Protein backbone atom coordinates (compact mmCIF):
# COMPACT_ATOMS: atom_id res chain seq x y z
CA UNK A 1 0.00 0.00 0.00
CA UNK A 2 1.29 3.40 -0.95
CA UNK A 3 0.39 6.63 0.84
CA UNK A 4 -0.69 8.39 -2.38
CA UNK A 5 -3.99 9.49 -3.93
CA UNK A 6 -3.98 6.35 -6.10
CA UNK A 7 -2.89 4.17 -3.17
CA UNK A 8 -5.72 5.14 -0.81
CA UNK A 9 -8.32 4.16 -3.43
CA UNK A 10 -7.80 0.57 -2.20
CA UNK A 11 -9.89 1.27 0.90
CA UNK A 12 -10.25 -2.36 1.85
CA UNK A 13 -6.50 -2.94 2.21
CA UNK A 14 -6.03 0.13 4.43
CA UNK A 15 -9.02 -0.66 6.61
CA UNK A 16 -7.85 -4.26 6.96
CA UNK A 17 -4.53 -2.89 8.27
CA UNK A 18 -6.47 -0.86 10.87
CA UNK A 19 -5.75 2.51 9.25
CA UNK A 20 -8.67 4.92 8.95
CA UNK A 21 -9.04 6.80 5.65
CA UNK A 22 -10.65 10.21 5.07
CA UNK A 23 -14.45 10.06 4.82
CA UNK A 24 -14.47 13.16 2.59
CA UNK A 25 -13.37 13.55 -1.04
CA UNK A 26 -9.70 14.52 -0.71
CA UNK A 27 -9.32 15.57 -4.35
CA UNK A 28 -12.39 17.78 -4.17
CA UNK A 29 -11.38 19.61 -0.95
CA UNK A 30 -7.83 20.05 -2.29
CA UNK A 31 -9.06 21.46 -5.60
CA UNK A 32 -11.35 23.88 -3.78
CA UNK A 33 -8.44 25.13 -1.64
CA UNK A 34 -6.27 25.62 -4.71
CA UNK A 35 -8.97 27.62 -6.50
CA UNK A 36 -10.10 29.62 -3.50
CA UNK A 37 -7.71 29.37 -0.52
CA UNK A 38 -9.15 30.03 2.91
CA UNK A 39 -6.52 28.89 5.41
CA UNK A 40 -2.75 29.07 4.84
CA UNK A 41 -0.12 27.71 7.22
CA UNK A 42 3.62 28.60 7.43
CA UNK A 43 5.99 25.98 8.87
CA UNK A 44 4.72 22.59 7.74
CA UNK A 45 6.59 20.12 9.94
CA UNK A 46 5.51 17.56 12.52
CA UNK A 47 3.34 19.55 14.94
CA UNK A 48 1.55 21.27 12.06
CA UNK A 49 0.62 18.05 10.29
CA UNK A 50 -0.63 16.12 13.31
CA UNK A 51 -2.22 18.99 15.26
CA UNK A 52 -3.34 21.75 12.87
CA UNK A 53 -3.74 19.32 9.95
CA UNK A 54 -5.55 16.97 12.33
CA UNK A 55 -7.97 19.72 13.42
CA UNK A 56 -8.71 20.59 9.77
CA UNK A 57 -9.17 16.88 8.99
CA UNK A 58 -11.69 16.59 11.83
CA UNK A 59 -13.58 19.67 10.61
CA UNK A 60 -13.69 18.22 7.08
CA UNK A 61 -15.05 14.94 8.48
CA UNK A 62 -17.80 16.86 10.32
CA UNK A 63 -18.66 18.99 7.29
CA UNK A 64 -17.62 22.10 9.26
CA UNK A 65 -14.90 22.91 6.69
CA UNK A 66 -15.24 22.60 2.93
CA UNK A 67 -11.63 22.84 1.72
CA UNK A 68 -8.11 21.85 2.74
CA UNK A 69 -5.16 23.88 3.99
CA UNK A 70 -2.49 25.58 1.89
CA UNK A 71 0.91 24.54 3.29
CA UNK A 72 3.84 26.98 2.96
CA UNK A 73 7.44 26.14 3.86
CA UNK A 74 9.75 29.10 4.51
CA UNK A 75 12.84 27.40 5.93
CA UNK A 76 13.47 23.82 4.77
CA UNK A 77 12.33 23.21 1.19
CA UNK A 78 13.34 19.52 1.43
CA UNK A 79 10.21 19.03 3.55
CA UNK A 80 8.01 19.96 0.56
CA UNK A 81 10.10 17.86 -1.84
CA UNK A 82 10.62 14.74 0.30
CA UNK A 83 7.55 14.53 2.57
CA UNK A 84 4.76 16.29 0.68
CA UNK A 85 5.30 15.74 -3.08
CA UNK A 86 6.05 11.96 -3.06
CA UNK A 87 2.94 11.29 -0.94
CA UNK A 88 0.53 13.62 -2.83
CA UNK A 89 0.38 15.87 0.29
CA UNK A 90 -1.21 13.08 2.36
CA UNK A 91 -0.08 12.60 5.95
CA UNK A 92 -0.45 9.72 8.39
CA UNK A 93 -1.30 10.49 12.00
CA UNK A 94 -0.23 7.97 14.66
CA UNK A 95 -1.75 8.71 18.08
CA UNK A 96 0.02 6.90 20.92
CA UNK A 97 -2.09 5.95 23.94
CA UNK A 98 -0.66 5.22 27.37
CA UNK A 99 -1.82 1.58 27.24
CA UNK A 100 0.28 0.93 24.11
CA UNK A 101 -2.59 1.06 21.62
CA UNK A 102 -2.42 3.37 18.59
CA UNK A 103 -4.89 5.15 16.32
CA UNK A 104 -3.83 5.37 12.66
CA UNK A 105 -5.51 7.91 10.37
CA UNK A 106 -4.64 9.18 6.89
CA UNK A 107 -4.98 12.99 6.82
CA UNK A 108 -6.28 14.48 3.59
CA UNK A 109 -6.55 18.10 4.74
CA UNK A 110 -3.22 19.27 3.30
CA UNK A 111 -4.22 20.56 -0.13
CA UNK A 112 -1.04 22.01 -1.55
CA UNK A 113 2.60 22.56 -0.52
CA UNK A 114 4.28 25.77 -1.66
CA UNK A 115 7.93 26.72 -1.22
CA UNK A 116 8.24 30.37 -0.16
CA UNK A 117 11.31 30.83 -2.30
CA UNK A 118 11.59 34.19 -4.06
CA UNK A 119 14.27 32.76 -6.39
CA UNK A 120 11.75 30.15 -7.65
CA UNK A 121 9.53 32.26 -9.93
CA UNK A 122 6.74 29.70 -10.29
CA UNK A 123 6.41 29.06 -6.54
CA UNK A 124 6.74 32.77 -5.69
CA UNK A 125 4.01 33.74 -8.15
CA UNK A 126 1.76 31.01 -6.74
CA UNK A 127 2.26 32.42 -3.25
CA UNK A 128 1.32 35.89 -4.52
CA UNK A 129 -1.89 34.49 -6.06
CA UNK A 130 -2.79 32.85 -2.75
CA UNK A 131 -2.29 36.05 -0.74
CA UNK A 132 -4.21 38.17 -3.25
CA UNK A 133 -7.30 35.93 -2.90
CA UNK A 134 -10.20 37.72 -1.14
CA UNK A 135 -11.31 34.28 0.16
CA UNK A 136 -8.22 33.98 2.40
CA UNK A 137 -9.23 34.30 6.07
CA UNK A 138 -6.25 33.24 8.12
CA UNK A 139 -2.56 32.42 7.99
CA UNK A 140 -1.34 30.32 10.92
CA UNK A 141 2.29 29.71 11.91
CA UNK A 142 4.43 27.04 13.56
CA UNK A 143 7.89 28.32 12.60
CA UNK A 144 9.40 28.09 16.14
CA UNK A 145 10.23 31.06 18.33
CA UNK A 146 13.40 31.70 16.32
CA UNK A 147 11.32 32.24 13.16
CA UNK A 148 10.11 35.64 14.40
CA UNK A 149 13.52 36.96 15.44
CA UNK A 150 15.00 39.81 13.39
CA UNK A 151 17.76 40.91 15.74
CA UNK A 152 20.58 39.29 17.66
CA UNK A 153 20.81 39.67 21.45
CA UNK A 154 22.95 42.81 20.99
CA UNK A 155 20.22 44.51 18.92
CA UNK A 156 21.91 44.26 15.51
CA UNK A 157 20.12 42.64 12.55
CA UNK A 158 20.77 39.02 11.66
CA UNK A 159 22.70 39.07 8.34
CA UNK A 160 19.78 37.50 6.39
CA UNK A 161 17.41 40.16 7.81
CA UNK A 162 19.81 42.93 6.82
CA UNK A 163 19.83 41.50 3.29
CA UNK A 164 16.01 41.25 3.27
CA UNK A 165 15.69 44.92 4.30
CA UNK A 166 18.17 46.00 1.64
CA UNK A 167 16.80 43.84 -1.19
CA UNK A 168 13.10 44.53 -0.64
CA UNK A 169 9.91 42.45 -1.01
CA UNK A 170 10.76 40.91 -4.40
CA UNK A 171 13.83 39.11 -3.01
CA UNK A 172 12.62 38.21 0.48
CA UNK A 173 14.17 35.11 2.09
CA UNK A 174 13.35 34.99 5.84
CA UNK A 175 9.87 34.04 7.06
CA UNK A 176 9.03 37.55 8.32
CA UNK A 177 10.18 39.20 5.09
CA UNK A 178 8.26 36.65 2.99
CA UNK A 179 5.11 37.26 5.04
CA UNK A 180 5.44 41.05 4.83
CA UNK A 181 6.05 40.83 1.07
CA UNK A 182 2.88 38.76 0.70
CA UNK A 183 0.90 41.23 2.81
CA UNK A 184 2.09 43.92 0.39
CA UNK A 185 0.64 41.83 -2.46
CA UNK A 186 -2.66 41.58 -0.57
CA UNK A 187 -2.66 45.33 0.07
CA UNK A 188 -2.15 46.04 -3.64
CA UNK A 189 -4.84 43.50 -4.59
CA UNK A 190 -7.56 45.36 -2.67
CA UNK A 191 -6.51 45.82 0.97
CA UNK A 192 -8.40 42.65 1.98
CA UNK A 193 -8.52 41.89 5.73
CA UNK A 194 -6.71 38.88 7.23
CA UNK A 195 -5.86 37.21 10.56
CA UNK A 196 -2.23 36.19 11.16
CA UNK A 197 -2.27 33.52 13.86
CA UNK A 198 1.00 32.52 15.52
CA UNK A 199 0.63 29.05 17.04
CA UNK A 200 4.19 28.83 18.31
CA UNK A 201 4.90 27.95 21.90
CA UNK A 202 5.96 31.38 23.16
CA UNK A 203 4.36 34.02 25.35
CA UNK A 204 2.22 36.68 23.66
CA UNK A 205 3.06 35.12 20.30
CA UNK A 206 0.65 37.38 18.40
CA UNK A 207 2.36 40.51 19.72
CA UNK A 208 5.73 39.08 18.73
CA UNK A 209 4.57 38.33 15.18
CA UNK A 210 2.99 41.79 14.86
CA UNK A 211 6.18 43.50 16.05
CA UNK A 212 8.27 41.65 13.45
CA UNK A 213 5.87 42.41 10.58
CA UNK A 214 5.64 46.11 11.52
CA UNK A 215 9.43 46.36 11.85
CA UNK A 216 9.91 44.82 8.40
CA UNK A 217 7.27 47.13 6.88
CA UNK A 218 8.82 50.21 8.50
CA UNK A 219 12.30 49.32 7.24
CA UNK A 220 10.97 48.81 3.71
CA UNK A 221 9.14 52.13 3.95
CA UNK A 222 12.43 53.85 4.87
CA UNK A 223 14.12 52.14 1.91
CA UNK A 224 11.34 53.27 -0.46
CA UNK A 225 9.92 49.81 -1.24
CA UNK A 226 6.44 50.37 0.26
CA UNK A 227 4.20 53.39 0.90
CA UNK A 228 2.51 54.94 3.96
CA UNK A 229 -0.78 53.30 3.02
CA UNK A 230 0.77 49.86 3.43
CA UNK A 231 2.07 50.76 6.89
CA UNK A 232 -1.41 51.93 7.87
CA UNK A 233 -2.91 48.69 6.46
CA UNK A 234 -0.68 46.32 8.50
CA UNK A 235 -0.91 48.52 11.62
CA UNK A 236 -4.72 48.49 11.80
CA UNK A 237 -5.76 45.41 13.81
CA UNK A 238 -9.31 45.75 12.50
CA UNK A 239 -7.86 44.88 9.07
CA UNK A 240 -4.77 42.79 9.83
CA UNK A 241 -5.27 41.02 13.18
CA UNK A 242 -2.64 39.15 15.17
CA UNK A 243 -4.60 36.89 17.56
CA UNK A 244 -2.71 35.38 20.48
CA UNK A 245 -2.80 31.62 21.08
CA UNK A 246 -1.75 28.92 23.55
CA UNK A 247 -0.76 25.58 22.01
CA UNK A 248 -0.01 22.29 23.73
CA UNK A 249 0.62 18.82 22.32
CA UNK A 250 3.66 16.65 22.99
CA UNK A 251 4.98 15.69 19.54
CA UNK A 252 8.28 13.75 19.66
CA UNK A 253 10.46 13.00 16.63
CA UNK A 254 9.09 10.29 14.32
CA UNK A 255 9.96 6.87 15.74
CA UNK A 256 11.87 4.36 13.63
CA UNK A 257 10.00 1.59 15.44
CA UNK A 258 6.67 3.04 14.28
CA UNK A 259 8.04 3.32 10.72
CA UNK A 260 8.94 -0.38 10.86
CA UNK A 261 5.52 -1.27 12.33
CA UNK A 262 3.73 0.64 9.55
CA UNK A 263 5.80 -1.13 6.91
CA UNK A 264 4.95 -4.46 8.58
CA UNK A 265 1.26 -3.51 8.18
CA UNK A 266 1.94 -3.11 4.45
CA UNK A 267 2.42 0.67 4.13
CA UNK A 268 5.43 1.34 1.88
CA UNK A 269 8.19 3.97 2.23
CA UNK A 270 7.59 5.07 5.83
CA UNK A 271 11.20 5.63 6.92
CA UNK A 272 12.06 9.01 8.51
CA UNK A 273 14.44 11.33 6.68
CA UNK A 274 16.92 13.87 8.02
CA UNK A 275 17.10 16.82 5.64
CA UNK A 276 20.22 18.86 4.87
CA UNK A 277 18.91 21.44 7.38
CA UNK A 278 18.66 18.72 10.05
CA UNK A 279 14.85 18.50 10.08
CA UNK A 280 13.88 15.04 11.36
CA UNK A 281 10.65 14.16 9.60
CA UNK A 282 8.71 11.21 8.17
CA UNK A 283 5.55 10.61 6.10
CA UNK A 284 3.82 9.92 9.44
CA UNK A 285 3.73 11.91 12.69
CA UNK A 286 3.54 10.25 16.12
CA UNK A 287 2.06 12.20 19.03
CA UNK A 288 -0.03 11.96 22.19
CA UNK A 289 -3.81 12.30 22.01
CA UNK A 290 -4.38 15.23 24.43
CA UNK A 291 -4.14 18.64 22.79
CA UNK A 292 -5.04 22.22 23.64
CA UNK A 293 -5.27 25.22 21.34
CA UNK A 294 -6.71 28.40 22.87
CA UNK A 295 -7.21 31.11 20.23
CA UNK A 296 -8.09 34.78 20.62
CA UNK A 297 -11.25 35.26 18.56
CA UNK A 298 -10.09 38.12 16.33
CA UNK A 299 -10.66 37.35 12.63
CA UNK A 300 -11.50 40.43 10.49
CA UNK A 301 -12.24 38.38 7.35
CA UNK A 302 -14.26 35.65 9.11
CA UNK A 303 -12.97 32.20 10.03
CA UNK A 304 -13.72 28.48 9.85
CA UNK A 305 -15.69 26.93 12.74
CA UNK A 306 -12.46 26.35 14.66
CA UNK A 307 -14.31 25.87 17.96
CA UNK A 308 -15.64 22.55 16.60
CA UNK A 309 -12.07 21.22 16.40
CA UNK A 310 -10.80 18.70 18.96
CA UNK A 311 -9.12 20.56 21.84
CA UNK A 312 -9.79 24.06 20.43
CA UNK A 313 -11.10 26.89 22.61
CA UNK A 314 -11.99 30.37 21.33
CA UNK A 315 -11.49 33.15 23.88
CA UNK A 316 -10.51 36.77 24.47
CA UNK A 317 -6.88 37.92 24.69
CA UNK A 318 -6.74 38.02 28.49
CA UNK A 319 -7.96 34.42 28.75
CA UNK A 320 -5.46 33.23 26.12
CA UNK A 321 -2.65 34.93 28.04
CA UNK A 322 -3.70 33.32 31.34
CA UNK A 323 -3.99 29.88 29.70
CA UNK A 324 -0.54 30.26 28.16
CA UNK A 325 1.00 31.42 31.44
CA UNK A 326 -0.65 28.50 33.23
CA UNK A 327 1.01 26.02 30.87
CA UNK A 328 4.39 27.68 30.37
CA UNK A 329 5.09 29.07 33.84
CA UNK A 330 3.43 26.47 36.06
CA UNK A 331 1.97 23.24 34.79
CA UNK A 332 3.81 21.58 31.93
CA UNK A 333 6.98 23.30 30.76
CA UNK A 334 8.64 23.96 34.16
CA UNK A 335 8.41 20.24 34.95
CA UNK A 336 10.13 19.42 31.64
CA UNK A 337 12.90 22.00 32.14
CA UNK A 338 13.47 21.21 35.84
CA UNK A 339 13.72 17.44 35.39
CA UNK A 340 14.77 16.85 31.74
CA UNK A 341 18.41 18.07 32.02
CA UNK A 342 18.75 16.27 35.37
CA UNK A 343 17.45 13.13 33.67
CA UNK A 344 20.28 13.34 31.12
CA UNK A 345 22.85 13.68 33.93
CA UNK A 346 21.26 10.72 35.75
CA UNK A 347 21.50 8.55 32.63
CA UNK A 348 17.78 8.24 31.86
CA UNK A 349 17.04 8.38 28.13
CA UNK A 350 13.24 8.53 28.29
CA UNK A 351 11.40 11.14 30.35
CA UNK A 352 8.37 8.92 31.10
CA UNK A 353 10.53 5.94 32.08
CA UNK A 354 12.44 8.17 34.51
CA UNK A 355 9.26 9.38 36.24
CA UNK A 356 7.75 5.89 36.28
CA UNK A 357 10.80 4.21 37.83
CA UNK A 358 12.53 6.87 39.96
CA UNK A 359 10.34 7.85 42.92
CA UNK A 360 12.48 10.88 43.78
CA UNK A 361 12.28 12.32 40.25
CA UNK A 362 8.51 11.82 40.23
CA UNK A 363 8.32 13.52 43.62
CA UNK A 364 10.40 16.45 42.34
CA UNK A 365 8.22 16.79 39.22
CA UNK A 366 5.07 16.83 41.37
CA UNK A 367 6.60 19.42 43.71
CA UNK A 368 7.37 21.74 40.77
CA UNK A 369 3.76 21.67 39.58
CA UNK A 370 1.54 20.95 42.59
CA UNK A 371 3.47 22.38 45.57
CA UNK A 372 5.27 25.34 44.02
CA UNK A 373 3.41 26.21 40.81
CA UNK A 374 -0.31 25.86 41.52
CA UNK A 375 -0.37 28.14 44.62
CA UNK A 376 0.59 31.18 42.49
CA UNK A 377 -1.13 30.40 39.16
CA UNK A 378 -4.03 32.52 37.93
CA UNK A 379 -7.03 30.47 36.79
CA UNK A 380 -7.82 31.21 33.11
CA UNK A 381 -11.42 30.05 33.60
CA UNK A 382 -11.75 27.95 30.44
CA UNK A 383 -9.18 25.38 31.63
CA UNK A 384 -8.78 24.34 35.26
CA UNK A 385 -5.09 24.45 36.30
CA UNK A 386 -5.70 21.63 38.80
CA UNK A 387 -7.38 19.41 36.18
CA UNK A 388 -4.64 20.25 33.64
CA UNK A 389 -1.90 19.16 36.07
CA UNK A 390 -3.86 16.06 37.10
CA UNK A 391 -4.13 14.99 33.45
CA UNK A 392 -0.38 15.57 32.99
CA UNK A 393 0.56 13.30 35.89
CA UNK A 394 -2.18 10.70 35.44
CA UNK A 395 -2.11 10.31 31.65
CA UNK A 396 0.45 12.36 29.76
CA UNK A 397 3.77 12.26 31.62
CA UNK A 398 3.67 8.48 32.36
CA UNK A 399 3.11 7.58 28.66
CA UNK A 400 6.31 5.67 27.76
CA UNK A 401 4.96 4.93 24.28
CA UNK A 402 5.52 8.59 23.35
CA UNK A 403 9.27 7.98 23.46
CA UNK A 404 9.98 11.57 24.54
CA UNK A 405 13.64 11.96 25.57
CA UNK A 406 15.24 13.98 28.33
CA UNK A 407 17.78 15.22 25.77
CA UNK A 408 14.96 16.81 23.73
CA UNK A 409 13.73 18.51 26.90
CA UNK A 410 17.25 19.90 27.47
CA UNK A 411 17.30 21.75 24.10
CA UNK A 412 17.48 25.57 24.43
CA UNK A 413 16.76 25.55 28.18
CA UNK A 414 18.77 28.80 28.61
CA UNK A 415 16.16 30.53 26.44
CA UNK A 416 13.34 29.32 28.68
CA UNK A 417 14.52 29.56 32.31
CA UNK A 418 13.08 33.08 32.63
CA UNK A 419 9.54 32.21 31.61
CA UNK A 420 9.55 28.69 33.09
CA UNK A 421 11.26 29.38 36.44
CA UNK A 422 11.67 33.15 36.79
CA UNK A 423 7.97 34.00 36.56
CA UNK A 424 7.04 31.69 39.45
CA UNK A 425 9.99 32.95 41.52
CA UNK A 426 8.80 36.54 40.87
CA UNK A 427 5.26 35.56 41.93
CA UNK A 428 6.64 34.25 45.25
CA UNK A 429 8.61 37.47 45.80
CA UNK A 430 5.42 39.47 45.19
CA UNK A 431 3.32 37.25 47.47
CA UNK A 432 5.75 36.50 50.31
CA UNK A 433 8.57 39.07 50.01
CA UNK A 434 11.07 36.47 48.79
CA UNK A 435 11.15 33.00 47.21
CA UNK A 436 13.16 31.24 49.91
CA UNK A 437 10.37 28.72 50.62
CA UNK A 438 10.88 27.15 47.15
CA UNK A 439 12.80 23.86 46.92
CA UNK A 440 12.05 22.00 43.66
CA UNK A 441 12.56 24.99 41.34
CA UNK A 442 16.00 25.88 42.79
CA UNK A 443 16.82 22.16 42.58
CA UNK A 444 15.87 22.24 38.89
CA UNK A 445 18.07 25.29 38.26
CA UNK A 446 21.00 23.67 40.10
CA UNK A 447 20.34 20.48 38.11
CA UNK A 448 20.39 22.34 34.79
CA UNK A 449 23.78 23.90 35.64
CA UNK A 450 25.09 20.52 36.86
CA UNK A 451 23.93 19.04 33.52
CA UNK A 452 25.96 21.78 31.75
CA UNK A 453 29.17 20.19 33.09
CA UNK A 454 28.53 17.35 30.57
CA UNK A 455 29.58 14.63 33.04
CA UNK A 456 26.91 12.24 34.31
CA UNK A 457 26.33 10.99 37.86
CA UNK A 458 28.57 7.99 37.21
CA UNK A 459 31.41 10.20 35.92
CA UNK A 460 30.87 9.50 32.20
CA UNK A 461 30.92 12.32 29.64
CA UNK A 462 27.97 13.08 27.33
CA UNK A 463 27.11 15.58 24.62
CA UNK A 464 24.89 18.53 25.49
CA UNK A 465 21.66 19.19 23.62
CA UNK A 466 21.78 22.25 21.30
CA UNK A 467 21.47 25.58 23.13
CA UNK A 468 22.73 29.02 22.01
CA UNK A 469 24.36 29.58 25.44
CA UNK A 470 26.18 26.24 25.77
CA UNK A 471 29.62 27.71 25.02
CA UNK A 472 29.18 30.79 27.20
CA UNK A 473 27.96 28.84 30.23
CA UNK A 474 30.53 26.06 29.82
CA UNK A 475 33.25 28.72 29.68
CA UNK A 476 32.01 30.15 33.00
CA UNK A 477 31.97 26.69 34.60
CA UNK A 478 35.18 25.34 33.06
CA UNK A 479 37.23 25.26 36.30
CA UNK A 480 34.66 23.21 38.20
CA UNK A 481 35.65 19.55 38.55
CA UNK A 482 33.12 16.88 39.53
CA UNK A 483 34.45 15.14 42.65
CA UNK A 484 36.33 18.27 43.76
CA UNK A 485 33.73 20.59 45.33
CA UNK A 486 36.50 23.00 46.38
CA UNK A 487 36.87 23.96 42.67
CA UNK A 488 33.44 25.59 42.93
CA UNK A 489 33.66 29.13 44.28
CA UNK A 490 31.54 31.90 42.77
CA UNK A 491 31.23 30.72 39.15
CA UNK A 492 27.42 30.61 39.27
CA UNK A 493 26.99 34.22 40.43
CA UNK A 494 27.05 35.88 36.97
CA UNK A 495 24.48 33.34 35.74
CA UNK A 496 22.10 33.36 38.71
CA UNK A 497 22.15 37.17 39.01
CA UNK A 498 21.47 37.63 35.27
CA UNK A 499 18.02 39.25 35.00
CA UNK A 500 18.08 38.85 31.22
CA UNK A 501 18.15 35.08 31.77
CA UNK A 502 15.87 34.63 34.79
CA UNK A 503 13.82 37.89 34.63
CA UNK A 504 14.97 38.46 38.25
CA UNK A 505 18.25 38.39 40.22
CA UNK A 506 17.98 35.04 42.04
CA UNK A 507 20.12 36.32 44.94
CA UNK A 508 17.77 39.26 45.54
CA UNK A 509 14.86 36.80 45.30
CA UNK A 510 16.35 34.73 48.14
CA UNK A 511 17.19 31.57 46.16
CA UNK A 512 20.67 32.23 44.69
CA UNK A 513 22.58 30.79 47.67
CA UNK A 514 20.18 27.84 47.84
CA UNK A 515 20.92 26.99 44.18
CA UNK A 516 24.67 27.29 44.90
CA UNK A 517 24.43 24.92 47.89
CA UNK A 518 22.45 22.34 45.89
CA UNK A 519 24.92 22.57 43.01
CA UNK A 520 27.87 22.13 45.42
CA UNK A 521 26.27 18.96 46.78
CA UNK A 522 25.65 17.65 43.23
CA UNK A 523 29.36 17.82 42.31
CA UNK A 524 30.63 15.94 45.40
CA UNK A 525 31.36 12.80 43.36
CA UNK A 526 29.68 9.75 41.77
CA UNK A 527 26.05 9.38 42.85
CA UNK A 528 25.94 12.91 44.27
CA UNK A 529 23.14 14.11 41.97
CA UNK A 530 20.88 11.25 43.02
CA UNK A 531 21.72 11.76 46.69
CA UNK A 532 21.08 15.53 46.50
CA UNK A 533 17.68 15.09 44.86
CA UNK A 534 16.74 12.42 47.44
CA UNK A 535 17.73 14.72 50.30
CA UNK A 536 15.72 17.75 49.14
CA UNK A 537 12.54 16.08 47.89
CA UNK A 538 12.23 14.11 51.13
CA UNK A 539 13.13 16.94 53.51
Question: PLM features: residue spans?
Answer:
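Substrate/ligand-engaging "lid" and interaction regions
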Residues: 1-539
Amino acid sequence: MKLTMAGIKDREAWEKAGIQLPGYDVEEVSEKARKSPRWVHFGIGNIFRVFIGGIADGLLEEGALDRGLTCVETFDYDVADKIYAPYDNLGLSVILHGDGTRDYKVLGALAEAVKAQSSNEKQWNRLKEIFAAPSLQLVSFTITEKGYALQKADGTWFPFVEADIKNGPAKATGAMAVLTAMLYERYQAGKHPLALVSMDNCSQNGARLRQSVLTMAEEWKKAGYVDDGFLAYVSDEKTIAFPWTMIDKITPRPSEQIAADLEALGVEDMQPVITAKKTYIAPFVNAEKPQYLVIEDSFPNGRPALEKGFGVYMADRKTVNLAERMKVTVCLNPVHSATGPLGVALGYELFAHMLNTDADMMKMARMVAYDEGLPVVQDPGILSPQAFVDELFNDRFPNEYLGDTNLRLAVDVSQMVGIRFGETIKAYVEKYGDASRLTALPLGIAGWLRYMLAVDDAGKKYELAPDPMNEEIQEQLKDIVVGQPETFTDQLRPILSNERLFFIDLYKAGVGEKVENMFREMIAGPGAIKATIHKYVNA
